[in-house]
Amino acid sequence: MANIVVVGTQWGDEGKGKIVDMLAEKADMVTRFQGGNNAGHTVVVDGTQTITHLIPSGILQNKTCLIGNGVVVDPKVLLEEVDKLLGMGVEINADNLLISERAQIIMPYHQAMDHAREAKKGAQKIGTTGRGIGPCYEDKAARKGVRFVDLLDPAVFDSMVREACEEKNFLLTEFFKADPVDPDAIIAEYTEYAKRLAPHVVDVSVVLNQGVKDGKQVLFEGAQGTHLDIDHGTYPFVTSSNTVAGNVCAGSGVGPGQVNEVLGIVKAYTTRVGMGPFPTELEDEVGNRIQEKGAEFGATTGRRRRCGWLDMVLLEATARLNGLTGVAITKLDVLGGLDSLNICTAYECEGETLNFFPADLKVLAKCKPVYETMPGWTEDISGVRNFDDLPENARNYLNRVEELLGAPIKIISVGPGRDETMVVKDPFAG
């Protein structure tokens, strides 16, 4: 038995939703610990695609799903998601969907600030999703954010919203030259959300720790990817939370000793949405082919993902930052049909070889990938369910990735469906 944290190893969009959905079958509790509705986790069951943005993917397996204190929650989006899932026949109640009373709430003024800032930056924008995630985390750090425990106290909530709107409206109108927000409308709208969500609000830390004491298996579901981490990512082209495995404790209220396994989700190639350096990016027919075959469009934004070869310099940093105990390789099938495959094993920058991912984006922008080339395969592998049945060149590719990464491959995904997966070793077995 083990408690597992699942993290993205690249720039997000690695296929975490599918893997979490599969692992949830053996889990008792599934927990989100950071991020907001800027994440989109896609699950395909019996040909039906379901995308969740806030509710943990485990809800489709009727598991106890928890939204930790490290998550920033847009209650409107959350309730829209609840209603959509209920309409699909998914059971959601106050027993299987629990929200931390300490979780921060995204307010309309956060979204207004997000849009106003991006508009003012113009060409220098960082590519935010505009959902108010960053401004909400800012208010949290400034100790003036609204938590669920505050939302459920009408007098406290009223006072906090009016004070916040006074400050935000000054910035919106005077500095950004944007429209103000209406505190009365916000209070009325969010009071209705409070009525529906109140039964779901609990102390998630207490629930989780009691579950662990009772021998329940917990799956912690990360959002985005390691290199979007606010501290360790390609700053400032990052998200506003810590996406690495170490944040699972702070973001959900459990101790480090209660996390046994760290499973990194590795897409068989690399993708990135939005701005920022991308050393292995392919801006040719191969890149277009991968983009089209892999259907590389953001589940949350619909934006086209930039595509490139697998980057082991990037992944070395990921393994080091997260302490990976295993990996799941996704979208291996997308590489089928290519004559040869490249794996980036180092960077070359102004005559020097770099083996570690640089923090300075000016340096990263100058980095050229040093490639190791391997033969590809032509066979359709979407029906393969055992590692030994994969084409020899596919096995060689995976073995080389495992060797370079220094962490065992435990799961291989060869298609979007729940059944298009092979388990090399059960992560819950440790």
Curated annotation (Swiss-Prot):
Enzymatic class: ligase
Reactions performed catalytically: IMP + L-aspartate + GTP = N(6)-(1,2-dicarboxyethyl)-AMP + GDP + phosphate + 2 H(+)
Cofactor: Mg(2+)
Location in or out of the cell: Cytoplasm
Active site location: 13, 41
Cofactor binding comment, as recorded: Binds 1 Mg(2+) ion per subunit.
UniProt entry keywords in alphabetical sequence: Cytoplasm, GTP-binding, Ligase, Magnesium, Metal-binding, Nucleotide-binding, Purine biosynthesis
Gene that this sequence comes from: purA
GO molecular function, one term: magnesium ion binding
Protein name: Adenylosuccinate synthetase
Keyword Methyltransferase: no
SUPFAM superfamilies: P-loop containing nucleoside triphosphate hydrolases
Function: Plays an important role in the de novo pathway of purine nucleotide biosynthesis. Catalyzes the first committed step in the biosynthesis of AMP from IMP.
Binding locations of GTP: 12-18, 40-42, 305, 331-333, 413-415
Known pathway: Purine metabolism; AMP biosynthesis via de novo pathway; AMP from IMP: step 1/2
This protein's record includes keyword Cytoplasm: yes
GO cellular component annotations of the record: cytoplasm
Positions with a binding annotation for Mg(2+): 13, 40
Biological processes annotated in GO: 'de novo' AMP biosynthetic process; IMP metabolic process
Primary localisation category: cytoplasm
UniProt similarity note: Belongs to the adenylosuccinate synthetase family.
Residues involved in IMP binding: 13-16, 38-41, 129, 143, 224, 239, 303
Subunit and interaction comment: Homodimer.
A Pfam family annotated for this UniProt entry: Adenylsucc_synt
Residues at which substrate binds: 299-305
Known EC number: 6.3.4.4
